[in-house]
């Protein structure tokens, strides 16, 4: 087999470029990518169903001046976050042309020559940039993916070798898209406050208003033996809220519901929104962050962009006061967000292990 092109990671390790690997004629899948020996639930062949699907929430209905319409949609949102932890958001008001442009620009980025993409590679001690995060050792199993991760807000924390160096018009398109995602996340947080009937005025939105926003572009190449690999290891998101846009209609995202995996069929131009660990902590377990994973296709690539919306670094994170009562005692510890973030970044992706660490 030809020698694969290597990508240098921020921790000094190097891994093969799976996008370049996928272009080769592979007699067998390299052992570092195979999922043999995984727990039965994490095996690719574990029970997967297409019979159920995540709820669909209509933002126009949520914001409707008609009280009955708004209340019905708000109840649907509450149920979706409580029972599923995921929903698809439609009629969200984000311009269709902007969505088309961001899809085209991201595809263009991943199609750049490798020497162009590695200009944005991870630097020593950093997870941001082009590569693959959460790799801790030479013998760790690898996901069948390549990503470009970047902290986008607040502006003063942007890395000078990443966002400012992106080529035009990609940089301008991405800037516009991320701005829209920030505004959209604020609206969703406001609706979640309303659905929880919080006593605290802006008890949730104040924490996230000037908080961190991280972007992650995902590329999942085709794999000749998709049943042997994972595009993304099963995990729950650390964030408060995640908003994901699929760039094509290739399925691959699956969420865990009890002992089954449910495939999400992305609706055209809908956003897939999910509750993160921080939001589960803040709601004292009312809203649930849910394990999810990505599987890959034998012939088609899959691309997506996710934005993760978090609190300010100096914020104290813990269950919201009015959601802690003698009947519903605090389920999670409190902590400074920056310290909690460092703890999370020191871990590899592993189900809901971070939330287990935060439990009382």
Curated annotation (Swiss-Prot):
Tissue: Mainly expressed in stems, capsules and leaves and, to a lower extent, in roots.
Cofactor note (record): Binds 1 Fe(2+) ion per subunit.
Pathway it works in: Alkaloid biosynthesis; morphine biosynthesis
Known catalytic reactions: codeine + 2-oxoglutarate + O2 = morphine + formaldehyde + succinate + CO2; thebaine + 2-oxoglutarate + O2 = oripavine + formaldehyde + succinate + CO2; (S)-scoulerine + 2-oxoglutarate + O2 = (S)-3-O-demethylscoulerine + formaldehyde + succinate + CO2; thebaine + 2-oxoglutarate + O2 = neopinone + formaldehyde + succinate + CO2
One GO term (biological process): morphine biosynthetic process
GO MF assignments: codeine O-demethylase activity; metal ion binding; methyltransferase activity; thebaine 6-O-demethylase activity
Description of the deletion phenotype: Accumulation of upstream metabolites, such as codeine, thebaine, codeinone and neopine, but reduced production of morphine and oripavine. Lower levels of sanguinarine and 1-benzylisoquinoline laudanosine and, to some extent, of noscapine and papaverine in roots but increased accumulation of the protopine alkaloids cryptopine, protopine, O-demethylcryptopine and allocryptopine, and of the protoberberines sinactine, N-methystylopine, N-methylcanadine and rhoeadine N-methylporphyroxine.
InterPro entries: DIOX_N, IPNS-like_FE2OG_OXY, IPNS-like_sf, Oxoglu/Fe-dep_dioxygenase_dom, Plant_2OG-oxidoreductases
Binding-site positions, 2-oxoglutarate: 220, 302, 304
Reported function: Non-heme dioxygenase involved in biosynthesis of morphinan-type benzylisoquinoline and opiate alkaloids natural products. Mediates the conversion of codeine to morphine. Also catalyzes, with lower efficiency, the 3-O-demethylation of thebaine to oripavine and of (S)-scoulerine to 3-O-demethylscoulerine. Supports, with a lower turnover, the conversion of codeinone to morphinone, of thebaine to neopinone, and of neopine to neomorphine.
Name used for this protein in its record: Codeine O-demethylase
Record organism: Papaver somniferum
Gene: CODM
């Amino acid at each position: 087999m030809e020698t694969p092109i290597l990508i240098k990671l921020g921790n000094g390790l190097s891994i093969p470029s799976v996008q370049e690997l996928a272009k080769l004629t592979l007699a067998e899948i390299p052992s570092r990518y195979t999922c043999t020996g995984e727990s039965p639930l994490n095996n690719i062949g574990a029970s997967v169903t297409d019979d159920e699907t995540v709820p669909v929430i209509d933002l126009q209905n949520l914001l409707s001046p008609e009280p009955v319409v708004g209340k019905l949609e708000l109840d649907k949102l509450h149920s979706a976050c409580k029972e599923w932890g995921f929903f698809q958001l439609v009629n969200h008001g984000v311009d269709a042309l902007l969505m088309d442009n961001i899809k085209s620009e991201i595809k263009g980025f991943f199609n750049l020559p490798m020497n162009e993409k590695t200009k944005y590679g991870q630097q020593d001690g950093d997870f941001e940039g082009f590569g693959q995060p959460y790799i801790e050792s030479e013998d760790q199993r690898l996901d069948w993916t390549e990503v470009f991760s970047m902290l986008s807000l607040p502006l003063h924390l942007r890395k000078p070798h990443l966002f400012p160096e992106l080529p035009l018009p990609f940089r301008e398109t991405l800037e516009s898209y991320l701005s829209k995602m920030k505004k959209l996340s604020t609206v969703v947080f406001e609706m979640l406050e309303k659905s929880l009937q919080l006593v605290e005025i802006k008890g949730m939105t104040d924490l996230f208003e000037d908080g961190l926003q991280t972007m992650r572009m995902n590329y999942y190449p085709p794999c000749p033996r998709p049943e042997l690999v994972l595009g993304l290891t099963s995990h729950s998101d650390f964030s408060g809220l995640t908003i994901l846009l699929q760039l094509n209609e290739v399925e691959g995202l699956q969420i865990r519901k009890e002992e089954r995996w449910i495939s999400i069929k992305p609706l055209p131009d809908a956003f897939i929104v999910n509750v993160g660990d921080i939001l589960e902590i803040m709601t004292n377990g009312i809203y649930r962050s849910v394990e999810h994973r990505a599987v890959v296709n034998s012939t088609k690539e899959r691309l997506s962009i996710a934005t993760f919306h978090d609190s300010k670094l100096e914020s104290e994170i813990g269950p919201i006061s009015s959601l802690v009562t003698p009947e519903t005692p605090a389920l999670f510890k409190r902590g400074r967000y920056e310290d909690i973030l460092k703890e999370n970044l020191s871990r590899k992706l592993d189900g809901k292990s971070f939330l287990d660490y935060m439990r009382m």
